[in-house]
Amino acid sequence: YAPSALVLTVGKGVSAATVTPERAVTLTCAPGPSGTHPAADSACADLAAVGGDLDALTRSEGVMCPMIYDPVLLTVDGVWQGERVSYERVFSNECEMNAHGSSVLAF
């Protein structure tokens, strides 16, 4: 099997160079779901459904978030099915981040 192991972090701000991570979790999906992610089973299933493409994780319908700009930066680093992953995305606030990615970003 090709390894799939990721470290996800979130912190307030817009640049990985200046953001201090406030939370971090590990997520291992191969050979089986594990790690410190609170929903490893469903997060791995959600990632597998989009082939590990974090940009393909869609926003949950019906979630209402305040229109307040308080940016948070998500970083994801590691390997997915043996391929190196280094990903950053800024969300306008934490509610917007939680509304994306179903269980993957819920940590």
Swiss-Prot record:
Site Reactive bond — annotated at M67, I68
Keywords, A to Z, come to:
Disulfide bond, Protease inhibitor, Secreted, Serine protease inhibitor
Q: What is this protein called?
A: Alkaline protease inhibitor 2C'
Lineage runs: Bacteria, Bacillati, Actinomycetota, Actinomycetes, Kitasatosporales
Which Gene Ontology molecular-function terms are recorded?
A: serine-type endopeptidase inhibitor activity
What role does this protein play?
Strong inhibitory activity toward subtilisin.
Disulfide cysteine pairs (residue numbers): C29-C44, C65-C95
Subunit-structure text: Homodimer.
One GO cellular component term of this record is:
extracellular region
- Family the entry assigns: Belongs to the protease inhibitor I16 (SSI) family.
**Has keyword Disulfide bond?**
yes
Annotated compartments: Secreted
